[in-house]
C-alpha cells in the first residue's frame, strides 16, 4: 500500500463571535477558544491576545513542520522546546 497523500488545498471555516469589545469567541471543528485582552487593557484575560495568538500559531507550525521533516528523514525527536522572544513595537497600532 502506498503512502497517504495529503490534499494540497483544503477549505475550512472559522467563526468569531464578538462577546465583548475585547473578547472574541472562536469556533472551528467543534472547538471553541477565546482571544482576549488582559485586564489592564480592558479585557477579561480569558485567552491569548490577538498578537500572542499569531506568535502561538507560528510556534505550533514550527513544531508540526519540524516533526514532519524529522520523520521524513528517519529522525525521531525525543523532545523539542520552541522559544519565541518577541519585541512588538505598538506605535501605529494603538488606537
Tell where the protein language model's regions lie, with residue ranges:
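Alpha-helical metal-binding/catalytic segments enriched in His/Glu/Asp
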Residues: 58-62
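Extended beta-strand/beta-hairpin segments
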Residues: 1-56, 66-95
Amino acid at each position: 500500500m502506498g503512502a497517504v497523500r495529503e490534499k494540497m488545498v483544503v477549505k475550512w471555516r472559522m467563526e468569531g463571535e464578538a462577546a465583548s469589545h475585547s473578547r472574541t469567541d472562536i469556533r472551528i471543528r467543534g472547538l471553541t477558544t477565546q482571544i482576549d485582552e488582559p485586564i489592564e487593557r480592558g479585557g477579561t484575560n480569558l485567552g491569548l491576545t490577538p498578537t500572542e495568538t499569531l506568535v502561538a500559531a507560528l510556534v505550533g507550525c514550527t513544531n508540526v513542520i519540524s516533526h514532519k521533516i524529522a520523520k521524513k528523514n528517519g529522525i525521531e525527536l525525543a523532545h523539542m522546546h520552541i522559544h519565541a522572544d518577541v519585541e512588538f513595537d505598538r506605535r501605529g497600532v494603538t488606537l
